[in-house]
């Protein structure tokens, strides 16, 4: 909705994280809103910026309206790249970030699933709403042999081990952007606690997001987008209460080095047996 509200006319671009055919994640841009699906959905993966900053600057110099989405550190990087010049046509949007899993860990998980199901993974959906509720983080995988499986978050080794905060980059544990003072025009994230203070928005399974404007430009964009959304206003204290990463960075697991050492030498099956906190006999 924000992209559609900002990108009026015929000269615009929207940047975001896209999943590649190799199941990696990289920043790409679209110039047709009908292609927005490529940038939608969650990707719990490190997105490669590539030439996105340079492309953004070039498109702005051409007079295009641009929406650039990313993690807070990626938005900060874009602003540093662009320098002190103000770009009225640029709308920046960051997401509340929990850090990302190690690429080696993700690849090990995919290899394990491919061996288990005797086929290459064709698509990986980290949060499949068709397979379960938006807040259950149901993962779905489609294989080249046509097989399709879903794994509930609460019995998913991928999520359980990652969420132990045991594999993120060192900088994530000292993240300077885990505060209510953001570097973008708008901050987006899951509206955790929605069942408590907005129960009428909880049961449709579409998910509820929090939108926090940090600039006048951000407030203007949200007002324009409201026509396409069902909205409720909340005070900032309520939002921050349930959004941990707007208060503090993730805490480094004291066994991080041990885990990374295991990741270097163990297959995922052994990683799962040692580090999983739940019983996953059937996964």
Region spans (language model):
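Iron-sulfur-associated redox domains of electron-transfer enzymes in respiratory
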Residues: 1-281
